[in-house]
Amino acid sequence: MATLLRIDSSASGENSKSRQLANEFVEKWLAKNPEGKVVARDVTANPLPHFTGETLGALFTPEENRTAEQQAIVAIGDELIAELEAADLVIVSAPMYNFGIPSTLKSYFDHVARAGRTFKYTETGPVGLVNKDAYIFAASGSFLAGAPVDHQVPHIQTFLGFIGLNVKDTFIAGGQAMGEPGEDAFNQAKSQIAVAV
C-alpha cells in the first residue's frame, strides 16, 4: 500500500489556493491508488515549536544524557522524520507570505533537517538521505511564477533537495490578488496536475 505524506502550511484553510491544488493532486492520486494511504501534516492547524536554544541543546546532548524535557523536544523531530521515512511520496503546499514561506513551514524544515537521519556530511558536501519523490504546490498574491522576489518556491525546492527528496514538479498559482492573471495561473496549474499524476 502506497503512502502519501502531505504537508500543508497555509493559514487560509480551505480557501487556500495552494491547499486546493494539493487537494486536486491527492484526489487524482487516490483514484489511481485506491488502496493508498494519505498522512496529513498541517503545520498551521498544529504548529510546531520554533527552534530555541533549548532545542539545539537537546539535539546536541548525547541521547543517554538527555533530560526528560530534552527527550520530549527531540521526539518532535523524531515523529516528523518517521513520517517522511514511511512515506512513498511527499507533497508540500505553501503560500507566499512576505516574499517567503510561512514560519510554520520553516519550523517543520528545521525539525526534520537532522544529520545522520535526513542528510549526512561527506567530503564533497552534504548528501540527502530521504530518497523519495516530491511535488510542490505554491500560491502567491501579487507575483507570478518566476518573479525575482520569489524566495518561496526556491526555498522549498532547495530544502527538499537537501534532504534527498526528488522534486518531480512544482505547480504554482501566482498572482492570486491580480484578477484574471491569477485565475489563469490557477487553472493552468490544475491542468498540469491532471497530466502529472
Curated annotation (Swiss-Prot):
Its EC number is 1.6.5.-, 1.7.1.17. It catalyses: 2 a quinone + NADH + H(+) = 2 a 1,4-benzosemiquinone + NAD(+); N,N-dimethyl-1,4-phenylenediamine + anthranilate + 2 NAD(+) = 2-(4-dimethylaminophenyl)diazenylbenzoate + 2 NADH + 2 H(+). Binds 1 FMN per subunit. It is an enzyme of class 1 (oxidoreductase). SUPFAM superfamilies: Flavoproteins. GO terms for molecular function: electron transfer activity; FMN binding; oxidoreductase activity, acting on NAD(P)H as acceptor; oxidoreductase activity, acting on NAD(P)H, quinone or similar compound as acceptor. FMN binds at residues 10, 16-18, 96-99. Its cofactor is FMN. InterPro entries: Flavodoxin_fold, Flavoprotein-like_sf, FMN-dep_NADH:Q_OxRdtase_AzoR1, NADH:quinone_OxRdtase_FMN_depd. Keywords: Flavoprotein, FMN, NAD, Oxidoreductase. Pfam families: Flavodoxin_2 (PF02525). Belongs to the azoreductase type 1 family. Homodimer. Quinone reductase that provides resistance to thiol-specific stress caused by electrophilic quinones. This is FMN-dependent NADH:quinone oxidoreductase. It comes from Marinomonas sp. (strain MWYL1).
